[in-house]
């Protein structure tokens, strides 16, 4: 791992984390509405809605906080994370509610997905090797070889995630429609190096990773 990546990991790990101190048992009683899109246990049956089960608690909490901030009426451009389907849904929830919900979904077991064999080889090449000639690091540096992520550093679990959802996020990062990757803009930088075919292959490989 080169010095630039080590520095980046330390920076994101220290400054990019949301404090997570939720109660999973309490959270179970607060996720009824979430289940309509994400599944009652966080294993979303719909490919456009992310699986939350088994996701890192710190990452989940940060996304909930960012979505709440970005969905507030009149929120300045670039603040938080804008998810149209989530508009207004988090407004009534307190910080403790968000912490409890993150803890609950993080405690659930994520379901396994499957990769398209026709795309898996190219996807694996990108995930494990990046595009070093273009300055794009391997995904394994932050998300681990098996896609479990690094919760302490706030890097999300990717393995098993719906390919359609992952592809949408990579495209949004590339196009600047998602910007909550911190001052380092690491995901925007990575996604800028990916073609549509790269994103399709990488997303499919990630869906089958476990």
UniProtKB/Swiss-Prot annotation:
The keyword Transmembrane helix does not apply. InterPro entries: Cyt_c-like_dom, Cyt_c-like_dom_sf, Cytochrome_c4-like, Cytochrome_c_Oxidase_Subunit. The keyword Heme applies. Heme c 1 binds at residues 34, 37-38, 86. GO terms for molecular function: electron transfer activity; heme binding; iron ion binding. Binds 2 heme c groups covalently per subunit. It is found in: Periplasm. Pfam families: Cytochrom_C. Heme c 2 binds at residues 139, 142-143, 187. Residues 1-20 form the signal peptide. Keywords: Electron transport, Heme, Iron, Metal-binding, Periplasm, Signal, Transport. One of its GO terms (cellular component) is periplasmic space. Its main location: periplasm. PROSITE patterns: CYTC. Diheme, high potential cytochrome c believed to be an intermediate electron donor to terminal oxidation systems. This is Cytochrome c4.
